[in-house]
């Protein structure tokens, strides 16, 4: 009997201790199941073994595209599962390579045998390779063990054999939520989503916080932020994601009464971080993710007791554009959210006093208390 399924690997998870590894594998399996069911893919059955996770479902092709987005998945491929019989493995390997190999191209067969003494790795590679040459003789294929155009992988594990060829890179990292929750500020077209996505891949469940701010002409409308947020949502493998919306009119009004335009940018960010500190305590979040690519001023950071993470520091424009493309956001402007530059703070010796203004603090706490929710 031969069936098609998806084979996945999680290389970072296998490095953990047995207890932690079991916890992460269970979380990852649940998230794979939730992600597939959320998109209408049924008959999902998931097993694991030997550092691999096997996903059987009604639509392997559609499921593969979803699985590749799930943090914790290092690579995935559609595979054939058969009995560990040479003839069946030859059939599966030939089918794997038949459509992808062109005339005159080269291939290799890589085998791995675990818990099966009846078969040897070398014997599988020779016999499967010869079968491919014979059955696809019209393509005049060549064997190249050093740099093949295509590779057929055959894994024999006990009473099962898995054959696959097209390996696709996944998100990597750790399963979402295994490292706690964080608040992610969404305030621009693209960089906010990239920053939150990078922390998502490190195991943090991101609670998006959208800023409804009309501070100046460079401010991004909430509708535009929502589009970026919807793209980010496709990478979060949970059934229900709750985003928060902060209405900043009162805070902005007080800031404009107190400061000049250049100073207001810094006071604005400090006020937002103070509000997020209060929200983080209520939500049980362990950190705040910001997309700024320059170091924040200590006077601003000190207003937030919750740790602040800046994952975009150190990334150049080429890397950022690559990640924006991966997220599917489309062309984005690689610039600091809100135009906030750290060096401006050196010219504001009374920044701490401005941030501690009593009326401003009242507006900040009111904004945090009256936050709205959006179910994604």
Residue ranges and their predicted role:
Residues 12-15, 114-116, 251, 260:
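A short, flexible beta-alpha/helix-coil linker loop
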Residues 21, 25, 29, 60-64, ...:
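Generic alpha-helical secondary structure
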Residues 4-7, 23-26, 31, 35, ...:
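Nucleotide-activated chemistry modules centered on ATP-dependent adenylation/adenylyltransferase
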Residues 34-112:
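Non-catalytic nucleic-acid substrate-recognition regions in nucleic-acid-modifying enzymes
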């Amino acid at each position: 009997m031969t069936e098609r399924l998806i084979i996945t690997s999680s290389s970072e998870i296998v490095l953990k201790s047995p207890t932690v590894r079991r916890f992460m594998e269970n979380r990852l399996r649940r998230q794979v199941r939730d992600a597939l069911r959320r998109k209408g893919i049924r008959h999902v059955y998931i097993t694991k073994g030997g550092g691999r996770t096997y996903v059987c479902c009604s639509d392997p092709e559609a499921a593969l595209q979803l699985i590749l987005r799930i943090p914790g998945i290092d690579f995935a491929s559609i595979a054939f599962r058969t009995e560990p019989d040479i003839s069946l493995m030859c059939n599966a390997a030939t089918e794997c390579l038949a459509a992808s190999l062109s005339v005159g191209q080269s291939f290799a067969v890589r085998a791995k045998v675990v818990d099966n003494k009846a078969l040897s790795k070398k014997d599988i590679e020779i016999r499967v390779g010869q079968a491919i040459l014979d059955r696809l003789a019209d393509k005049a294929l060549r064997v190249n063990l050093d740099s093949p155009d295509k590779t057929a992988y055959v894994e024999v594990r006990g009473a099962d054999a898995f054959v696959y060829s097209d390996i696709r890179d996944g998100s990597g990292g750790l399963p979402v939520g295994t490292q706690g929750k964080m608040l992610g500020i969404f305030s621009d077209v693209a960089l906010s989503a990239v920053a939150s996505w990078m922390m998502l891949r490190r195991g943090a469940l991101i609670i998006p916080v959208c800023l409804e701010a009309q501070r100046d002409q460079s401010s991004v409308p909430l509708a535009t932020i929502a589009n970026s947020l919807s793209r980010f949502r496709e990478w979060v493998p949970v059934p229900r994601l709750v985003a928060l919306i902060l209405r900043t009119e009162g805070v902005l009004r007080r800031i404009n009464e107190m400061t000049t335009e250049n100073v207001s940018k810094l006071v604005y960010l400090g006020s937002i971080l103070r509000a997020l500190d209060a929200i983080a305590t209520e939500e049980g979040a362990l950190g705040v993710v910001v997309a700024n690519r320059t170091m924040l001023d200590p006077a601003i950071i000190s207003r937030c007791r919750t740790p602040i993470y800046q994952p975009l520091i150190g990334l150049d424009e080429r890397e950022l554009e690559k990640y924006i493309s991966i997220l599917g956001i489309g062309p984005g402007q690689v610039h600091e959210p809100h135009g906030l530059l750290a060096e401006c703070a050196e010219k504001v010796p009374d920044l701490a006093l401005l941030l501690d203004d009593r009326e401003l603090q009242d507006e900040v706490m009111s904004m945090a208390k009256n936050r709205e929710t959006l179910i994604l």
